[in-house]
């Protein structure tokens, strides 16, 4: 409603959210365009590198198809009759963003087990949060998680929990800085053979290449983190 009212073009970044559900809808089904990453550390990978753009807008799809295939015109290639000889098909600029057949096969096979993988990720996250609950309930070292990661036995709560499913690309813990230093906590995790990192990527516009652009904001966009 907000997007329609304000005439906003919605692009979903689903790079780390394969299989997630929000308000009963799969992530990637809200926007005009959804982007997906399949590089080596994502929930689904296509052999190391890769990605995908999805849309239900035919006009956008035709443009995207052209961009990934050297600027070819889809209708000229498939719907137009040509004389014998060379076919003139490139109506625009584009590049080679085409995924190989082998990469697609790897991704499609992983897609079959996506639901099972999400269940397993939720189960593992539940184990961690159960083991750490004293740290946020008793000692106030972590902020209490604000997502529902447990499946309830009651039908009412089960329906509610199915409306929101976390993909758990990562399990994020928010620290109370007054209680513990971040570096010390990370060292404790590593000591116990638990892989632990810091935060997430900051705003991309802060890269040097964008600083030279006329689009660079005069002030930090705090809500874009």
Question: What label would you give each PLM region?
Answer:
Residues 43, 47-52:
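Glycine-rich phosphate-binding loop of ATP-grasp-fold ATP-dependent ligases
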Residues 1, 9, 17, 21, ...:
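PLP-dependent aminotransferase class I/II
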Residues 33, 50, 63:
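Short acidic donor-binding loop at the edge of a beta-strand
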Residues 30-32, 47-48, 99-101, 168:
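A structure-centric signal for secondary-structure junctions around beta-strands
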């Amino acid at each position: 409603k907000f997007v329609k009212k304000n005439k906003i073009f919605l692009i979903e970044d689903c790079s780390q959210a394969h299989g997630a559900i929000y308000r009963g809808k799969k992530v990637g089904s809200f926007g005009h365009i959804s982007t997906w990453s399949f590089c080596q550390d994502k929930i689904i990978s296509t052999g190391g590198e890769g990605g995908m753009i999805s849309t239900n807008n035919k006009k956008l799809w035709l443009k995207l198809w052209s961009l990934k295939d050297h600027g070819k015109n889809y209708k000229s290639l498939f719907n137009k009759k040509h004389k014998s000889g060379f076919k003139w098909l490139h109506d625009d600029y584009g590049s080679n963003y085409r995924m190989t057949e082998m990469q697609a096969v790897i991704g499609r096979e992983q897609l079959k087990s996506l639901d099972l993988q999400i269940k397993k990720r939720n189960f593992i996250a539940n184990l961690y949060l159960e083991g750490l609950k004293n740290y946020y309930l008793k000692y106030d070292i972590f902020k209490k998680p604000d997502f529902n990661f447990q499946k309830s036995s009651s039908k009412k709560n089960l329906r509610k929990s199915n409306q929101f499913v976390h993909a758990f690309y990562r399990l994020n813990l928010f620290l109370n800085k007054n209680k513990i230093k971040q570096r010390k906590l990370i060292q404790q995790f590593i000591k116990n053979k638990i892989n632990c990192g810091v935060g997430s990527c900051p705003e991309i516009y802060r890269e040097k290449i964008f600083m030279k652009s006329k689009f660079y904001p005069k002030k930090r966009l705090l809500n874009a983190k």
